[in-house]
Amino acid sequence: GSSEREIVDLAQGDYEEMDQLAMARPFCKAAYRLTYAQDIGIAVARAIRSAISGRSGGVYLDIPGAMLDAAEGARSLVKVIEPAQRQIPAKSAIDRAIEVMKTAKRPLIVLGKGAAYDQCDDLIRELVEKSGYPFLPMSMAKGLLPDTHPQCAAAARSMVLKDSDVVIMMGARINWLLSHGKGKQWGEPGAKRFVQMDIEAEEMDSNVEIAAPIVGDVGSCCEALLKAMDGAGIAPPKEWLDAVNSKATANMAKMDARLRNNNDPMDYHGALGVIKDAINDHPDTILVNEGANTLDMCRSIVNIHKPRHRIDVGTWGVMGIGMGSAIAAAIETGKRVLAVEGDSAFGFCGMEVETVCRYNLPI
């Protein structure tokens, strides 16, 4: 429990005296403080709704220590009904997106972790395959479709980002992870048109102009687009698909030779080649990954075959969460977890290994 408010507010010197609510607010989606035990149930319900509705995020609930054993709190609990309701996109937004897609000569789909969080995997796969467009998964969207899928353009990432003319962002933000949609990575300025699906309207136009914004949850957006795509004439040109496949095949052949180098001492490529084979042989394994070079190279080398089976440092790039994430994944799923840690990142969380050993977790 947090420190007692009447002592903290007068700075009287309580044990671990700290205004935890004020400290949590800048870093959480929402932060609330309880004053009465009878409000525990409604406060927990509000925290759940805040955490998983709209764009999901962490919520801090400040509960003073005096309330932790209050019997009244248990009696106050409420059932949280539909905490994350669907957000249906406007028909005009879907129609506009189809018109933009019709103009595409070199289309690309970018899958983000928002699409993974939505857990509408079948709809996403249906839309990607029905469109025929090459797709590029961001790191925690890997596995929504297997990295071995014939439409996956991850091995031709530089080419498709630079040369595409219409880019469909599915639950992916155009932030630092994508160079804010600008610079050499994206080719000539103004040469691209973006279709963006996002549950938050404020995300649109955050870095570049969005030609067709679609506000809604990814599942509902996919359903609406799938219906509108029938007979719309949006098939990608064969020349574009052949060029992407040719580049991806050539890059994979070059990389494969480096992964089989068998150097002594072992280098990044040799180590990640072994890990890649292990994941391919055991695709149900959850991969946790953090670091700098370790993160970048592992993301591009190791295939992920199932949704939400890769956990990394996310948008903020915070180091030191890897082993904690591995523990959570093992406990929540019961699956085997493989943690690939950079040396510096492991330095922040290495003592978590003691917890792994104490509970004999499959990590």
Predicted stretch roles:
Residues S246-E332:
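Active-site diphosphate/adenylate-binding microenvironment
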Residues G1-P236, A278, R336-L338, T355, ...:
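N-terminal alpha/beta PP-like core and its mobile active-site loop of ThDP/TPP-dependent enzymes
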Residues I321, S325-L361:
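Catalytic phosphate/nucleotide-handling subdomain of diverse soluble enzymes
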Residues L108-G112, I286-N289, D343:
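Short hydrophobic beta-strand segments
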Residues G112-A116, R260-N261, P265, G342-S344:
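Conserved short loop/turn motifs at secondary-structure junctions
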Residues I40, A235-M252:
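Internal, active-site/partner-interface "lid" segment
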